[in-house]
């Protein structure tokens, strides 16, 4: 075979007997094909994912990662060796069967979390989402360099403006959820089956476990160019939506089990019909709400990409904008409907639960067919389930607090403080994750000061992540003031807006977000150093901690206000 540069390659394939049983000599001449295009075609058939050597790490010049060679030029044979080393696929199967043999990447990647993006071969999410490739020719040799995508530079003002609108939208969504919860707390199912209150933070926390994780992961994929191809984009979307339905169903069921146990421990009473109602309500709510929010989230990500807006700034807050309201409304409606059927149509409640649980194998099959989500079906449950348990503890605090008639005013503010804190910390975690994907490799941190992650390091410094932490913290007080007065103008809640109430509430909100941003700085870098994708691991923990911190600080605030005499005025009644 002769290419356009005069190189001759003859491919001899042994075949059956022909003219006396010799070999068949296949010689192809491709004089019309340019060598660099032909090489580009070959390389595009096999995605390249590889790890830098120790001495090659962090060598970067003008946005181009160097491979540690004396020149930027690599021959095709050298590149093939890298393919063989890091993909370990069968060459015979690849050529003879016109497909990829089942294989895995280097063992070094086995601990990297969750997803693989390389045509069905097992890899990690973090490694697969590294640099895109750029193939060029110097006119004499075929040179291959890898170009690192860069985020557009953002000033603090531009960043604040991009965050402000979705932040306010998300805030009004949580305010609406708080007002709905303030109303439905008087419904019969909430009064007779108080364990439903334990479900509230756990199910609302699904937006942190699933929706915000999906938003952050797809935002990172957009920023590093992994959604430029339509096929790759829809593989990511369909696989992630199917996976999310599996997780929502399982987490919804486990949240109900946790609510049953946590509700049984204080009083020692157990009711089978209440347990079935909790399981059915939780599973149905998680499934329906997750599906609706997932579709909305995909639209936001794709729309952000087309309009040139950084999805890291808008995707996670919009993921939560109506998430709380949708989830809470569905939970209240389904649980009240099933409760009204307990005496006359007792079989409806278990049938509802069984129906949604029976759909789980279908979603598992769909998710397993997409390489981007196959691995997480086995290894991605730890953060989701742990976050659910943390949120359920916050629900127990809420259930205990609302049992006191003097502290019922906490209900309307719980979704607000929890939602705002979770939204802001999810934005920061998503931005740090994108920064790490663009400036370092999994398991290695970029050139930053070593040592403990103390608050001064998080909020003060020249880095872009320091700047975003400052902007997010500054949004807390004006944002909460807007939401407090919105609740007041809507005549909702059971608490008068006194000066001391506003001061105590804002102190709790600022302390919550300050703590979460500090923890996020450490946690995202920690998971990256461990080779785990922070988009999938950190956000569930952070939003769950936001629920726990928000509920606990709010409960302490209301206890403090009661002790000093600033008590409820039954405004909402």
Swiss-Prot record:
Topology relative to the membrane: Multi-pass membrane protein
Reactions performed catalytically: Mg(2+)(in) = Mg(2+)(out); Mn(2+)(in) = Mn(2+)(out); Co(2+)(in) = Co(2+)(out); Ni(2+)(in) = Ni(2+)(out)
Phosphoserine: residues bearing it: 136-137
Subcellular location: Cell membrane
Keyword Phosphoprotein among UniProt keywords: yes
Ranges in a coiled coil: none
Residues in the Extracellular compartment per record: 1-162, 217-245, 304-313, 369-376, 428-469, 520-543
GO cellular component, one term: plasma membrane
Recorded family membership: Belongs to the SLC41A transporter family.
Name of the protein described by the UniProt record: Solute carrier family 41 member 2
Species in which this protein is naturally found: Macaca fascicularis
Lineage: Eukaryota, Metazoa, Chordata, Craniata, Vertebrata
């Amino acid at each position: 075979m002769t290419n356009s540069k005069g190189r001759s390659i003859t491919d001899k394939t042994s075949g059956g007997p022909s003219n006396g049983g010799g070999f068949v000599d296949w010689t192809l001449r491709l004089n019309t094909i340019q060598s660099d295009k032909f090489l580009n075609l070959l390389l595009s058939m096999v995605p390249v994912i590889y790890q830098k050597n120790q001495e090659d790490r962090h060598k970067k010049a003008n946005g181009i990662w160097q491979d540690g060679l004396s020149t930027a030029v690599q021959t095709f044979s050298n590149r093939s060796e890298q393919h063989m080393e890091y993909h370990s696929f069968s060459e015979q199967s690849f050529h003879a069967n016109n497909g990829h043999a089942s294989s895995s990447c280097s063992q070094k990647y086995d601990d990297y979390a969750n997803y693989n993006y390389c045509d069905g071969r097992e890899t990690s999410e973090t490694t697969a989402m590294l640099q895109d490739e750029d193939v060029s020719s110097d006119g004499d040799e075929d040179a291959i360099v890898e170009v690192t995508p860069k985020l557009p530079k953002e000033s603090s003002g531009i960043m604040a403006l991009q965050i402000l609108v979705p932040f306010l939208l998300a805030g009004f969504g949580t305010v609406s959820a708080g007002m709905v919860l303030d109303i439905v707390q008087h419904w019969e199912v909430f009064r007779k089956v108080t364990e439903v209150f334990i479900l509230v933070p756990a199910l609302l926390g699904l937006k942190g476990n699933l929706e915000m994780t999906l938003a952050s992961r797809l935002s990172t994929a957009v920023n590093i160019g992994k959604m430029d191809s339509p096929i790759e984009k829809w593989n990511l979307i369909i696989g992630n939506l199917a996976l999310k339905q599996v997780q929502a169903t399982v987490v919804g069921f486990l949240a109900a089990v946790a609510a049953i146990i946590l509700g049984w421990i204080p009083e020692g009473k157990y009711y089978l019909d209440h347990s079935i109602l909790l399981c059915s309500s939780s599973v149905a709510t998680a499934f329906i709400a997750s599906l609706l929010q997932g579709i909305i989230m995909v639209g936001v990500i794709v729309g952000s990409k087309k309009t040139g807006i950084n999805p890291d700034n808008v995707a996670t807050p919009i993921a939560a904008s109506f998430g709380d309201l949708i989830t809470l409304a569905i939970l209240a409606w389904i649980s009240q409907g099933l409760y009204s059927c307990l005496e006359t149509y007792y079989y409806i409640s278990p049938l509802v639960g069984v129906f949604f649980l029976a759909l789980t194998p279908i979603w598992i099959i769909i998710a397993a067919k997409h390489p981007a989500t196959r691995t997480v079906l086995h290894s991605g449950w730890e953060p989701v389930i742990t976050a659910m348990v943390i949120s359920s503890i916050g629900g127990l605090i809420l259930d205990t607090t609302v049992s006191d008639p003097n502290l019922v005013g906490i209900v309307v503010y719980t979704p607000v403080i929890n939602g705002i804190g979770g939204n802001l910390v999810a934005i920061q975690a998503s931005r740090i994750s994108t920064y790490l994907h663009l400036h370092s490799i999994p398991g290695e941190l970029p050139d930053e000061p070593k040592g403990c992650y103390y608050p001064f390091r998080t909020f003060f410094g020249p880095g872009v992540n320091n700047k975003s932490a400052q902007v997010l913290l500054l949004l807390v007080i004006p944002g909460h003031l807007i939401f407090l007065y919105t609740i007041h103008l809507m005549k909702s809640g059971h608490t008068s807006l006194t000066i001391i109430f506003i001061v105590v509430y804002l102190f709790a909100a600022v302390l919550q977000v300050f703590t979460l941003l500090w923890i996020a700085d450490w946690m995202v870098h920690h998971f990256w150093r461990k080779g785990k994708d922070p988009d999938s691991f950190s956000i569930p923990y952070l939003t769950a901690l936001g629920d726990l911190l928000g509920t606990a600080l709010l409960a302490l605030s209301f206890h403090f206000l009661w002790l000093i005499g600033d008590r409820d005025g039954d405004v909402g009644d």
